[in-house]
């Protein structure tokens, strides 16, 4: 359902206590994706809340954000070249209102309307000069609900980092004791090598070389359908595939089929998946809550005439992940430095980047599952729904993002591909036998 908003106020929120005035060095990965952001929207049902006045709720959000920024102080800084100046410049907080009821909006989700729940650039503001963190609190009609939209610069945070920050902010809003709230490790160059402006003059843009602007759609895989898909995805080498392996393999197959439906001459295709280093490196080396773009990648490729069989892709998925995990294990147990490990991870990323070509369909896939986004409770309960505002964030990138469904067992998949491909993709009967296209969220 189309959403019309009225912006009530916009202000800069500074940390409640001064931050150390130092600089945070960006890694090669941070700098390379500096123009992208991580956009998320948390929807809350306030219908049964006693104190649901927008003024009261907004004050709590703003006050707790100021306190949270004292711990996550680089988010209140400014990107300058290949570093973050921790200068307490602050985050931008916008308050908006709509007459539409939350239940009405969630029953008929308009994918294109989601992006207006994410903070936009101010007049005269460029991608490079925007705040590292922007927040928008949108109040729905008759006190029915609230959407907290956040946009965090990708130069400082990946999805796991955003989860750590938002859960920390929410804990502050709930009034948790300071003993439970610690300052996280900002580990931008703990693994990956630092960016050098003389070498990395500008963020890389190879991912934007696709045929046309991408459009986004949402697909929901319920747990029972995932169970059936896993049976198809299983093989002798991988008898028990994960839901992420099975769903990503199906999506790649269907996206490739949609692309071929619009081409006279078939194209080669490639998919890449990022892997969270926090889950693979010992905690004495890297904190599970470390902030940064702490990812490695692997990729799979198919020629123009090759078929994409789900079980075969899953087997390759598993093999690549196991080899990646073994490489990390050997480096850590062998006493090698983080620099050595970072160089090996970067070598894999460089191999992937060298494969990016305009005549190859490349799908950038990430799993944001198990990131505890449904645990973000500001004091009025857990989210009724967590959505993404990923339209127009980085034009030209074909992406697939997996997030948990609210029950923790199903998966919501956000797919961004060229419009003509999407027209065929949403009609793929194999896909629709496992997934529902943008179903309502009932509260």
Curated annotation (Swiss-Prot):
Name of the gene encoding the protein in the UniProt record: BAHD1
EC number: 2.3.1.-
InterPro entries xrefs: CAT-like_dom_sf (IPR023213)
Any further remark recorded for this protein: Constitutes with three contiguous genes an operon-like gene cluster that is involved in the thalianol pathway.
Tissue distribution: Expressed primarily in the root epidermis.
Family the entry assigns: Belongs to the plant acyltransferase family.
Pfam families in alphabetical order: Transferase
Enzyme class: transferase
GO terms for MF: acyltransferase activity
Active-site positions on this chain: 154, 377
Organism field: Arabidopsis thaliana
Gene3D superfamilies: Chloramphenicol acetyltransferase-like domain
Protein name (database record): BAHD acyltransferase At5g47980
Keywords for this protein: Acyltransferase, Transferase
Record's function text: Probably involved in the modification of desaturated thalian-diol.
């Amino acid at each position: 359902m189309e959403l019309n908003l009225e912006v009530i106020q916009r202000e800069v929120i500074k940390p409640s206590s001064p931050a150390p005035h130092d600089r945070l060095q960006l890694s090669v990965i941070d700098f390379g994706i500096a123009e992208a952001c991580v956009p998320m929207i948390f929807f809350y049902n306030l219908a049964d809340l006693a104190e649901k006045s927008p003024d009261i709720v907004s004050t709590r959000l703003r006050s707790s954000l100021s306190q949270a920024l004292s711990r996550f102080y680089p988010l209140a800084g400014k990107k300058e070249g290949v570093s973050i100046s921790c200068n307490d410049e602050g985050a931008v907080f916008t308050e908006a209102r709509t007459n539409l009821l939350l239940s009405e909006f969630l029953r008929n989700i308009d994918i294109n309307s989601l992006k207006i729940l994410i903070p936009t650039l101010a007049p005269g503001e460029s991608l490079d000069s925007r705040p590292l963190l922007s927040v928008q609190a949108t109040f729905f009609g008759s006190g029915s609900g609230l959407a907290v939209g956040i946009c965090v610069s990708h130069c400082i945070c990946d999805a796991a980092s955003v989860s750590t920050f938002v859960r920390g902010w929410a804990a502050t809003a709930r009034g948790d004791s300071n003993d439970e709230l610690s300052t996280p490790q900002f580990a931008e160059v703990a693994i990956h090598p630092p960016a050098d402006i003389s070498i990395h003059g500008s963020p890389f843009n190879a991912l934007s070389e696709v045929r046309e602007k991408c459009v986004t759609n949402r697909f929901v895989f319920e747990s029972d359908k995932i169970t059936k898909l896993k049976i198809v995805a299983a093989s002798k080498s991988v008898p028990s595939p994960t839901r992420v392996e099975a769903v990503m393999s199906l999506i790649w197959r269907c996206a490739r089929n949609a692309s071929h439906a619009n081409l006279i001459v078939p194209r080669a295709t490639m998919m890449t998946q990022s892997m969270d280093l926090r889950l693979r490196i010992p905690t004495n080396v890297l904190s599970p809550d470390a902030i940064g773009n702490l990812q490695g990648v692997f990729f799979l490729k198919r020629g123009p005439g090759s078929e994409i069989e789900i079980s075969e892709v899953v087997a390759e998925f598993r093999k690549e992940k196991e080899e990646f995990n073994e490489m990390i294990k050997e480096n850590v147990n062998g006493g090698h430095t983080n620099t050595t490990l970072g160089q090996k991870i970067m070598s894999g990323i460089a191999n992937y980047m060298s494969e990016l070509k305009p005549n190859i369909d490349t799908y950038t896939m990430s799993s944001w599952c198990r990131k505890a986004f449904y645990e973000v409770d500001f004091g009025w309960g857990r989210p009724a729904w967590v959505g993404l505002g990923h339209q127009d964030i980085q034009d030209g990138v074909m992406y697939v993002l997996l997030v948990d469904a609210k029950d923790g067992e199903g998966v919501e998949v956000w797919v961004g591909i060229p419009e003509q491909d999407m027209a065929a993709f949403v009609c793929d009967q194999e896909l629709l036998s496992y997934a529902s296209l943008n179903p309502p969220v009932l509260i």
